[in-house]
Amino acid sequence: LQVSPLAFGGNVFGWTVDEAASFKLLDAWLDAGFNFVDTADVYSYWVPGHSGGESETIIGKWLKQSGKRSRVVLATKLGKSMGEGKVGLSPAYIREAVEASLKRLQTDYIDLYQSHDDDANTPLEDTLGAFDDLVKAGKVRAIGASNFTAPRLAEALDVSERLGIARYESLQPLY
């Protein structure tokens, strides 16, 4: 993936920035020569009356209405709690979460799908195997990690190498 040197973080979409302003910001971002847009399924779960997915939904509407999907390197994340047991990096939850994100984003693939947090309760072999399945199915182009410690990232990279499966290609540290 070839990304611009800066990513536009979509955390604000759907709570501090409304849909119309979000569309204008995304248009300006692309017009300025940038291409990398980052969001997460959990944005903006914490706002009263929200259920998560609001940012992805706005980005999806913008992608569909603008026709600019081919110009965007789209990143999203999963794994933080969205309530009702929707949390973690189990293979079953990864499969469920990617389908929900694809639907909200109104696209058939995600360029960079990231683990938003480590999940110590799920073996890395299982998590990375599920991500590998998504890459092979064409639903995800690459995978990344967010909020991982250096030792845990190293362990994940070792697992991927040992098993010959998709590996974390990026690290997004805590803001």
Locations of regions flagged by a protein language model:
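Conserved catalytic core of Hanks-type protein kinase domains
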Residues: 29, 77, 104
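Short histidine/acidic/glycine/proline-rich micro-motifs that form metal-
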Residues: 12-14, 42-49, 80-81, 117-120, ...
